[in-house]
């Protein structure tokens, strides 16, 4: 960088400055290329994450619909009369037992 101060002729100084300028321009071009590549990677990653989140949104929407329907049917069954109370208790106990069996099996499968 300080070579231009030691040069004797004006042509030599211009040549040294020109080489240094080209070197710095090449360095800048490579940095710009890396930044552009990084920006494109970030853009692709953001698009992928948006698609993933949109898919999750539709999954949650469909699951909400299923749960809403199940709760409505369960509430209707609970309000329909005393004869169904035994059935309702049986279903509730069955679901609780199934939950514990499933959690036990999953804990055994992990180990």
From Swiss-Prot:
InterPro entries tied to this protein: BET1_SNARE (IPR039899), T_SNARE_dom (IPR000727)
GO biological process, one term: regulation of retrograde vesicle-mediated transport, Golgi to ER
Subcellular location: Golgi apparatus membrane; Golgi apparatus, trans-Golgi network membrane
Example of a GO MF term: SNAP receptor activity
GO cellular component, one term: Golgi membrane
Keywords of the record: Coiled coil, Golgi apparatus, Membrane, Phosphoprotein, Protein transport, Transmembrane, Transmembrane helix, Transport
Domain of life: Eukaryota
Record has Transcription regulation as a keyword: no
Positions of modified residues (Phosphoserine): 9, 37
Topology relative to the membrane: Single-pass type IV membrane protein
Entry coiled-coil feature ranges: none
Lumenal-facing ranges: 108-111
Keyword Magnesium: no
Topology feature Cytoplasmic, residues: 1-86
Subunit structure: Component of a SNARE complex consisting of STX5, YKT6, GOSR1 and BET1L. Interacts with STX5.
Role summary: Vesicle SNARE required for targeting and fusion of retrograde transport vesicles with the Golgi complex. Required for the integrity of the Golgi complex.
PANTHER family to which the protein is assigned, alphabetical: GOLGI SNARE BET1-RELATED
Name used for this protein in its record: BET1-like protein
Lineage of origin: Eukaryota, Metazoa, Chordata, Craniata, Vertebrata
């Amino acid at each position: 960088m300080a070579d231009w101060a030691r040069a004797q002729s004006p042509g030599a100084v211009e040549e040294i400055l020109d080489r240094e300028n080209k070197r710095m321009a090449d360095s800048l071009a490579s940095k710009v290329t890396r930044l552009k590549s990084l920006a494109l990677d970030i853009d692709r990653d953001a698009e992928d994450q948006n698609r993933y989140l949109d898919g999750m949104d539709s999954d949650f929407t469909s699951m909400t619909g299923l749960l809403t329907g199940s709760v409505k049917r369960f509430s209707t069954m609970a309000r329909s009369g005393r004869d169904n109370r035994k059935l309702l208790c049986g279903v509730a106990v069955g679901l609780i037992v199934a939950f514990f069996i499933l959690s036990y099996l999953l804990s055994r499968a992990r180990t």
